[in-house]
From Swiss-Prot:
Function field: Probable mitochondrial adenylate carrier that catalyzes the transport of ATP, ADP and AMP, but not ADP-glucose. Recombinant BT1 shows a unidirectional mode of transport in intact E.coli cells. May function as a plastidial nucleotide uniport carrier required to export newly synthesized adenylates into the cytosol. May be involved in abiotic stress response.
Protein's membrane topology: Multi-pass membrane protein
Compartments where located: Plastid, Chloroplast inner membrane; Mitochondrion inner membrane
Family membership noted in the UniProt record: Belongs to the mitochondrial carrier (TC 2.A.29) family.
Biological process annotations from GO: transmembrane transport
GO CC annotations, alphabetized: chloroplast; chloroplast envelope; chloroplast inner membrane; mitochondrial inner membrane; mitochondrion; plasma membrane; plastid
Solcar repeat segments: 108-191, 202-286, 296-384
Domain of life: Eukaryota
Organism, scientific name: Arabidopsis thaliana (Mouse-ear cress)
UniProt note on regulation of activity: Inhibited by pyridoxal 5-phosphate but not mersalyl.
Residue ranges of the TM segments: 113-133, 168-188, 204-224, 263-283, 302-322, 359-379
Disulfide bonds: none
Name by which UniProt lists this protein: Adenine nucleotide transporter BT1, chloroplastic/mitochondrial
Tissue specificity: Expressed in root tips, the central cylinder of young roots, and maturating and germinating pollen.
Length: 392
């Protein structure tokens, strides 16, 4: 029989407690016994913390095997204190908060961003799902004429679960889209942003261009799903399901049909994404400059993200109104607009400037908290997903 071994203490880890490095070798020859350093319980009094980690285990013989778990760290900070850090040549104070902090080690930076974006999209969509449900009921005129009446009607007939009806489908759609959007923004923004103290080589802000790229990427990824979703809703009985709809559209109408009407959607999405990310990036820089702190807390990120969402929604809402007017322009009794500029001018002439912002309130009710929660979750996940042990 082979033996298994566990090394219980290893002071070289300097305070790490690890169970996911826990591995074992089993050898047919008892003389080939190789204990694998796995469970560490040595705690440093000056910086006590616990960690769950794993390392790549190599084969220790022809007749041996090993098991390993994912990298998972927890770090406990016993008290509140301040420490100084140097950022771009300036000394800034950073608060260290007590509590238990979870760290997950993922070496690939792209994977860290994608996972953070997916979590951000799923959480933000779930949190605002009740608002989306109430807004949908108001649009179709079911359940009441006000948000309060609709909420009471849903709670009476369906309970809390009624507020989250259809949320799983939205999460499946939004999570990968948000992951790609945030990944593209951060990647492009880092590539285009000049080093500290140097002038930018491009005439427009890097975050504005990166936001536009993020909007284009997100739209290109999700547009076929939106089109199929619309077909399934309107043309009931034609398709058996989502995969059948995809196959029939590609087979009978061609792959380009999946992107029919893409241009108007880009006109609506890209300006919002560009201004949203530009506002978020600018507000974060302004906060750092004002507070003299490099680290931005979760509550501050929530407020900054919400404010960025409000600013971008207000700035681009006239384009959204014009786009919707163009979509219904062929209906009897309505003006047929030549282009978006013509639609904007016509709305201004007939309804005044307030016509550009009709419906802004209900739209912000959903978009503003969703933007804040999404950015907060994204930044929080980036702090949890680390590259190496030193970041713990």
């Amino acid at each position: 029989m082979g033996k298994t071994g566990i090394q219980l203490f290893d002071d070289s880890r300097n305070g790490f407690f690890s169970v996911s490095d826990l591995g074992f070798d089993s050898s047919l020859n008892s003389s080939n016994y190789h204990p694998i350093g796995g469970l560490f319980a040595s705690v440093n009094q000056t910086n006590p913390f616990a960690s769950l980690s794993s390392s790549d285990l190599s084969n220790r013989g022809n007749n041996s095997f090993s098991t390993q778990l994912n990298d998972l760290y927890t770090k406990y900070m016993p008290g509140k204190e301040e420490e100084e850090e140097v950022v771009n040549g300036e000394k800034r104070k950073r608060k260290k908060k007590g509590g238990l902090t979870l760290k997950i080690k993922i070496a690939n930076p792209s994977l860290r961003r994608l996972l953070s974006g997916a979590v951000a999209g799923a959480v933000s969509r779930t949190v605002v799902a009740p608002l989306e449900t109430i807004r949908t009921h108001l649009m179709v005129g079911s359940g009441g004429n006000s948000s309060t009446e609709v909420f009471s009607d849903i709670m009476k007939h369906e309970g809390w679960t009624g507020l989250f009806r259809g949320n799983l489908v939205n999460v499946i759609r939004v999570a990968p889209a948000r992951a790609v959007e945030l990944f593209v923004f951060e990647t492009v923004n880092k590539k285009l942003s000049p080093p500290h103290g140097q002038e930018s080589k491009i005439p427009i802000p890097a975050s504005l261009l990166a936001g536009a790229c993020a909007g284009v990427s997100q739209t290109l990824l999700t547009y076929p799903l939106e089109l199929v979703k619309t077909r399934l809703t309107i043309q009931r009985g034609v398709y058996k399901g989502i995969f059948d709809a995809f196959l029939k559209i590609i087979r009978e109408e061609g792959p380009t049909e999946l992107y029919r009407g893409l241009a108007p959607s880009l006109i609506g999405v890209v300006p919002y994404a560009a201004t949203n990310y530009f506002a978020y990036d600018s507000l974060r820089k302004a906060y750092r400059s004002f507070s003299k702190q490099e680290k931005i807390g979760n509550i501050e990120t929530l407020l900054i993200g919400s404010l960025a969402g409000a600013l971008s929604s207000t700035a681009t809402f006239p384009l959204e109104v014009a786009r919707k007017h163009m979509q219904v322009g062929a209906v009897s009794g309505r003006v047929v607009y030549k282009n978006m500029l013509h639609a904007l001018v016509t709305i201004l002439e007939h309804e005044g400037i307030l016509g550009w912002y009709k419906g802004l309130g209900p739209s912000c009710l959903k978009l503003v908290p969703a933007a804040g929660i999404s950015f907060m979750c994204y930044e929080a996940c980036k702090k949890i997903l680390i590259e190496n042990n030193q970041e713990a």
